[in-house]
Amino acid sequence: MKCVEVYKELYHQEPFDVAFCPYRISPLGAHIDHQYGKINGLAIDKGIHMAYHPKQNGVVELQSLNFPKRAQFFVSAVPDEKQGDWADHLRGAAKMLGEKYRLKVGLSGIIEGSLPIGGLSSSASVIICFLSALCKVNGIHLEPMEMILTAKAAENQYVGVSCGKLDQSCEVLSKKNHLLYLDTKDDSYELIPTSEKMKPYKVAIFFSGLERSLKNSKYNLRQDECKAAAYALMGYAGMDYDTFANTRLRDVPFEVFEAYKERLPELWRRRAEHYYSEFARAEKGAELWRKGDLEGYGQLVFESGKSSIYSYECGCDELKKLYEIMTDTDGIYGGRFSGAGFKGRCMALIDPDKAEDIEVKVTTEYLKAFPALNGKYSFHFCESADGVEL
């Protein structure tokens, strides 16, 4: 790992340890975790590594191999306001952890992401990787749900991204060769083993060549549109409702949506249509995975991608082109945008025997459409993996 070599060169010592947090994919359940929907997810064998060593003076000193500028702050005196750089995720993590535990020991470290930024929950991976190291040097043990909620709070309350808990849950709870089936309303989950009847598969990652940050996207706006739809539907139906901030589409039965959907503004109706259809796909997908029906599962993933484009209305021209190519490529069982879907990448479940042909076809057609991205676009094969070690 390059982070280890850079650490040794910079600090003239071996790192104390190397923390790792996997990236994740979510084939089904896209854009509904923040509405307390159900999701399907997998951790993959690519992610964030951090070579580090404790600092007894309480200073956190971190450098990223993916971003400029070294981060430095006292673990017990994190700035109250974000600084607007990549290290806000680290400051937020320390801030949230420090609200529950006394932090005395800092650390020096080098952080390295194994894939380009965007669409694989890299921000959540950075936070969880850092939290696991910070906990270790301070003698703190977090249970899985506590790690998930601490990492989520760092993004929500400090970075300013209104994410749900899909990313963190996949990265913490996942198990190799299993599908995580999670209800984000009550945090109940099931790890569904890959059936012996299921055909072999690999995860393919198509990086568009465009990196993105949720802070400047329409990610938060889409959530507000979902909440607005829920709030209006509850009002039309005469239901009891809470504040706008505490309202979710999960609070609204599908029958209420069907009865009053024509009264919603078109954009709000589309967002709600995506929520209800994606919720159903996540439920059906779990059953198909249990049965080993990879073709049927893949078709649901393609349907999810279509709904993200036309009902949730995310995606840029480049991601839409990748999706279009995937739907017409032999050997791809199913694919869609990965992550928020405003830039970043697409993911697919593929037939391993056709991996080389898939790589050639997708790459050729994509770069024919966007030649300026030659050298930035990339293709990666991954396997399912265990979640972070706590």
For the regions a protein language model found, what residue spans apply to each?
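FabD-like malonyl-/acyl-CoA
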Residues: 125-127, 345-350
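Glycine-rich phosphate-binding loop
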Residues: 342
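Short Gly/aromatic-enriched secondary-structure transition segments
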Residues: 36-43, 222-223
